[in-house]
């Protein structure tokens, strides 16, 4: 496992995530470049919403991607950056997918990205994907989403 430590510096088995608003575009690659990262799991504990996984990959540290100056200056666990726009090209993002699933994201923040999977949350399912894949929540949260995530390394 390769999960963040607790506030008491103990190993954790993963993270419970309760979201009332969509989680924006990011990657969960960690911060230790000596590790060989592997997979991330998502266990839905509610049935509301989707997670959008992109084909695009990022090999830097855990990063939240944005073009919003306020978001770029925000402090948090992840680094903040707009460098993805220089990596994946300027191809316009699919307007229908944006409208149906990603209304919380500025469509210009999604330039050059290509969807691999739109995973509909279902109790009892387990989503497993590479930690280098960019991903985010859909904007389809009725009240809240609750899930459990883990990260692995080799």
Which ranges hold each PLM region?
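Catalytic core of non-heme Fe(II) oxygenases with the double-stranded beta-helix
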Residues: 18-133, 138-154
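A short coil-to-beta-strand element that immediately follows conserved catalytic motifs
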Residues: 2-15
């Amino acid at each position: 496992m390769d999960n963040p430590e607790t506030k008491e510096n103990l190993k954790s088995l993963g993270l419970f995530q309760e979201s009332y608003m969509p989680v924006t575009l990011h990657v969960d690659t960690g911060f230790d470049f000596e590790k060989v990262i592997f997979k991330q799991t998502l266990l839905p504990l509610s049935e509301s919403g989707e997670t959008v996984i992109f084909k695009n990959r990022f090999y830097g540290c855990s990063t939240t991607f944005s073009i919003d100056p306020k978001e770029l200056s925000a402090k948090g666990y992840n680094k903040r950056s707009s460098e993805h726009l220089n990596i994946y090209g300027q191809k316009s993002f699919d307007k229908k997918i944006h409208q149906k699933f990603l209304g919380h994201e500025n469509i210009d923040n999604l330039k050059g990205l290509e969807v691999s999977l739109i995973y509909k949350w279902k109790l009892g399912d387990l989503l497993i994907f590479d930690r280098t894949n960019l991903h985010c929540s859909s904007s389809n949260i009725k009240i809240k989403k609750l899930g459990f995530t883990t990260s692995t390394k080799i």
